[in-house]
Amino acid sequence: MSTVIAVVGPTAVGKSDLSVALALRLTEHGLPAEIINADSMQLYQGMDIGTAKLTPEERRGVPHHLLDVWEVTQTANVADYQRMARAVIDDLHAAGRVPVLVGGSGLYVRAALDELDFPGTDPKVRARLEAELAEQGPLALHARLARLDPEAARAILPTNGRRIVRALEVIEITGGPFTATLPDHVSRYPCVQIGLTAPRPELDERIALRVDRMWEAGLVDEVRALEKAGLRDGFTASRALGYAQILRFLAGECTEEEAKEETVRATRRFARRQESWFRRDPRVHWLPYDAPDLVDRAFALVCEHSDLCFRSATRDEQS
């Protein structure tokens, strides 16, 4: 079975740039590569600035898949993403191309790469929990989750009502902890996972600079436009980092500067959770984000831990 490459790690560490550079390097070696998005918020149409979605120019001619597939009013569903991602992976393999999965949404990465089956839903249980979320707020439900499944609570942001509700729903339906539905790391495809890491002070600074750039690039105006398209009604998209804070500003619940400062704080907290998630996966090969030979080292990992480079060399000898 053909290999998948994944580039993972916390936000603002440089995953997208590395994925493009690595795809180009693979293509140069006769291994045409294409990129599959594994950032849950980049799946949404129009959420460009706040998700740091690469522009067409920044993609440097490398085909990208699973960007802009959902409207902002649609609730994210990891099982739907799993079906889409696996279909793209299988299509690329059939075409003789190398899939490069990139993103920091840990559950989405695992859904694409691993043997994971997601429990079904119970509309009555879901409706009751969503009503409790609306009445009590996410912090109260997160405290309940912490009592029932401490490991799941550590992995889910206390403000992420959607994921808290889903975890509580699974616990109620299955009678077991939510984390029991995430078994040991069993790969569906041969995979080389490359993780980018940065010292915390440097990553914190990169996050602050990124938020500054997003504001300068017009994030507030982007949110205003998406609000007209139904962003407030989107159960998932309205809670995205930056978007949730600006929606509060537009509603008069805080100042713009407070929204910006909270975006920085919330993003830093999220980055810590992302790194903790990926650190638990022993298959990830970690590289420093600022290594001067980063692309060379990433390509070397691909050659060392897969047969891709051997296949490329064999084709060269036969041609």
Swiss-Prot record:
GO function terms (MF aspect): ATP binding; tRNA dimethylallyltransferase activity
InterPro entries: Dimethylallyltransferase (IPR039657), IPT (IPR018022), P-loop_NTPase (IPR027417)
Function recorded in the entry: Catalyzes the transfer of a dimethylallyl group onto the adenine at position 37 in tRNAs that read codons beginning with uridine, leading to the formation of N6-(dimethylallyl)adenosine (i(6)A).
Catalytic reaction list: adenosine(37) in tRNA + dimethylallyl diphosphate = N(6)-dimethylallyladenosine(37) in tRNA + diphosphate
Chain positions of site Interaction with substrate tRNA: S105, R126
Designated name of the protein: tRNA dimethylallyltransferase
A family per Pfam: IPPT
Region spans: Interaction with substrate tRNA: 39-42
Keywords linked to the UniProt accession: ATP-binding, Magnesium, Nucleotide-binding, Transferase, tRNA processing
HAMAP family (UniProt xref): IPP_trans
Binding residue positions for substrate: T11, A12, V13, G14, K15, S16
Residues involved in ATP binding: G9, P10, T11, A12, V13, G14, K15, S16
Record family assignment: Belongs to the IPP transferase family.
The EC number(s) this enzyme carries: 2.5.1.75
Originating species: Thermobifida fusca (strain YX)
NCBIfam families linked: miaA
Cofactor: Mg(2+)
Subunit text: Monomer.
SUPFAM superfamilies per UniProt: P-loop containing nucleoside triphosphate hydrolases
PANTHER family: TRNA DIMETHYLALLYLTRANSFERASE
Enzyme class: transferase
Gene designation per UniProt: miaA
GO BP term (any one): tRNA modification
